[in-house]
A protein has these predicted regions:
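Compositionally biased, low-complexity/repeat regions
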Residues: 247-258, 356-456, 462-463, 467-470
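Active-site proximal loops enriched in glycine and acidic residues that flank catalytic Cys/His/Asp
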Residues: 1-3, 13, 29-32, 50-58, ...
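ATP-dependent carboxylate/acyl-activation modules
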Residues: 1-51, 260, 283-291, 298-370, ...
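Cofactor-cradling patches in redox/metallo enzymes
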Residues: 11-21, 27-97
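Amphipathic alpha-helical packing elements
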Residues: 69-91, 177-213, 446, 451, ...
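Active-site loops and adjacent core secondary-structure elements that bind or stabilize anionic groups
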Residues: 108-336, 341, 360-362
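Conserved phosphate-handling catalytic cores of large alpha/beta enzymes
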Residues: 65, 69-77, 82-145
């Protein structure tokens, strides 16, 4: 797993599948710098290198790693996998950085064996690599064509189409306390009741919704066996307290100022203690559709309404790694992965349970809520809990503000890595919004004018924020002087896949055909 990323369940499954097919696998673990991966590949005389990552900053790290392979003259096949990755990202971002060897996106463990076999075959390797590269060239071209049809608004126009809320009749509920509240060693048995099992099966690449998957004609038998093992282990986890769950929640007076949410120290609302910066959708919408930002759901300061914002961080991973390593050292890789997958499910269940208690008890804006587990999974509740680094706020750096307000590291032992992943990995954090009209959405691709504005509001250099926001940029960052705005008549720059929100932009000065075509178009050239 690349530098700054802590997630390894999928990687571990791939490793086991390859080992079962008589391949030797050297697993370097998590948060591994590029230099260490390259050094180990040289020392061990590796035939193939595989990279994995879950959070979006890992995409840039993979692109950097590919460029390092090229710079250092290595010619090893490079496999790319993980939840944030895609064929489009691999074709447009990684493959152009590494021309000396084949780059292959592997979307699941079952495909890994066939890919490795082709790359290890003296007869097949060259033809297979050529096929993949030709396929990626087509993907890049299709991606470019698709972007030409997508129209985006200037930031000013997008703000003019913000979510309209009638604040004149709104009276926010007041939380039962301000500041933070810590929950140490939360009862695991309470979390079991609200586990969402569908993602658990997805970890094992079993497609289907729970509980219907248990009776599926294709994967039902395997799913039932896996579920039985999981329930037995879960019973032991709870009974023997293999690891503990801890959480911290908090509420603060807050009001929106433009696209920002200003957080105050107390009800006097005279001393700001933090600011959450939000991003706004810029894709041109159909009539009646709005360009949302999370700040739209907090009462503006000039309304005089006393609104609030909440935050949380929870973990079920305290002790998880020790248990997983115990199984691994006993050569029980299956149980090692199973315990990690269950810790993830418990962490998500903890987030669900705390949000439920916030709505009914701690903030109390929905005291009479009576939703069952299925309704909770479908998010039929009032209010939202968006998380930094996810579609409604794709900037992972906003976690730093949340963690500072919660004092999360001291309170519950959860830390942020250099890429703003949470450690332990089985942790969840986010914000609480109470407005009944708030909803989840994806920001999608954004233009340079918004990135300039966002960087200025955060007080950070433009190039730094372009790096953190790379997966959602609808332009190619360059060393040229930034423009102040875009016009609605400009053709959009070649961008990152609007369907795939995890696509990163190209590096400055990239010489791939994708860029050449764009530069020719800008210069008025044909073709």
């Amino acid at each position: 797993t690349v530098k700054g990323d802590v997630h390894d369940i999928g990687k571990n499954i791939v490793g086991i599948v390859l080992q079962c097919n008589n391949y030797e696998v050297i697993d370097l673990g998590v948060m591994v710098p590029a230099a260490k991966i390259i050094e180990t590949a040289r020392v061990e005389k590796a035939d193939i290198v595989g990279l994995s990552g879950l959070i979006t900053p890992s995409l840039d790290e993979m692109g950097y790693f590919a460029a390092e392979l090229e710079r250092q003259g290595l010619k090893l096949p490079l496999l790319i996998g993980g939840a944030t990755t895609s064929r489009v990202h691999t074709a447009v971002k990684i493959d152009p950085n590494y021309q000396s060897g084949p780059v292959v996106h592997v979307n699941d463990a079952s495909r890994a064996v066939g890919v490795v076999a082709s790359l290890m075959s003296a007869e097949r390797r060259e033809a297979y690599a050529s096929e993949v590269r030709a396929e990626y060239a087509k993907i890049s071209a299709a991606h470019f064509r698709a972007q030409q049809d997508k129209k985006r608004l200037t930031l000013a126009a997008a703000r003019a189409n913000a979510v309209p809320i009638d604040w004149s009749t709104y009276r926010p509920a007041t939380p039962t306390f301000l500041g933070t509240k810590v929950f140490s060693d939360y009862p695991l048995e309470e979390l079991v009741e609200v586990i969402d099992w569908t993602p658990f099966f997805q970890v094992w690449e079993l497609t289907g919704r729970f509980p219907a998957i248990l009776d599926d004609k294709v994967v039902g038998e395997t799913a039932r066996s896996l579920y039985d093992d999981a329930r037995k282990m879960l019973e032991k986890i709870v009974k023997e307290k293999w690891f503990k769950a801890s959480g911290v929640i908090g509420f603060w007076p807050a009001n929106s100022v433009g696209d920002d949410v200003v957080v105050y120290s107390d009800e006097s609302r005279t001393t700001p203690i933090a600011t959450y910066h939000t991003l706004r959708q810029q894709l041109e919408k159909r009539e009646g559709r709005r360009n949302a930002a999370l700040s739209d759901f907090i009462a503006p300061k000039d309304t005089g309404i006393a609104d609030y914002i909440g935050g949380f961080a929870v973990t079920a991973g305290l002790g998880e790694d020790e248990i997983a390593m115990r199984f691994k050292n006993a050569n029980d890789d299956y149980s090692s992965i199973l315990v990690k997958a269950l810790a993830d499910r418990l962490a998500e269940a903890f987030a669900e349970r705390m949000h439920q208690r916030v709505r009914k008890e701690f903030w109390g804006y929905a005291p009479d809520e009576t939703l069952n587990n299925e309704q909770l999974i479908k998010e039929e509740y009032k209010g939202i809990r968006p998380a930094p680094g996810y579609p409604a706020q794709p900037d992972h750096t906003e976690k730093a503000t949340l963690f500072k307000l919660l004092d999360a590291t001291r309170a519950i032992g959860v830390e942020l890595t250099e890429s703003f992943a949470m450690w332990p990995g089985s942790s969840v954090s986010g914000l609480y919004y109470s407005h009944p009209e708030s909803y989840y959405f994806g920001v999608g691709k954004i233009e340079r004018d918004q990135v300039e504005d966002y960087a200025a509001r955060k007080g950070r250099p433009l190039q730094e924020m372009e790096r953190w926001l790379a997966p959602i940029l609808n332009y190619i960052p360059s060393r040229e002087a930034p423009v102040s705005s875009i016009s609605s008549g400009d053709a959009p720059a070649p961008a990152n896949d609007a369907v795939d929100a995890d696509m990163s932009s190209h590096p400055p000065g990239c010489g791939c055909a994708f860029h050449l075509r764009y530069r020719n178009r800008k210069a008025g050239a044909n073709g």
